[in-house]
Amino acid sequence: MPRGSSMDKQVIKADVPETGGPFNLCVRYGNQIYISGLPPFDADFAGKLREARAKGAPLPPFPDIPFERQARIVMDHLKELVEAAGSNMDCLLKVIVWLKDQRQQEEFDRIYRSYFSSTDALPARTRMQAGRTPMDCGLEVEAIGYVP
């Protein structure tokens, strides 16, 4: 099988805070979309992370944000990236969810379901408890989807 050219790979940008880590948040290859693990970092906190990384300084502590707000930040960012790639949430094929505390699964599932048009539109999903999440936040979510 011939190798694709770099022209086939497109980095997708959206109004989602970048942390300054060595990765892209979203990459489109043909009609496939790959979304990196998204922690619940708002623009303010992501800016503090970028600044600390640029200076080689200690990273700031994660702010005390209620879990419901963290879940909505992550899902809003996921939706923004999917739409920036030219797709929609119903076109996600696989989602991986890491929860810091599995006791929050019902609350997360309630929020998660609200981002899809129907039960039939839900993607395949793996959910697990993480030993440690980025900056000790409540969750992280990554996804694979397609552009119809």
Task: Mark where each language-model region is.
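N-terminal presequence-like segments and the immediate start of the first folded domain
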Residues: 1-76, 80-94, 99-148
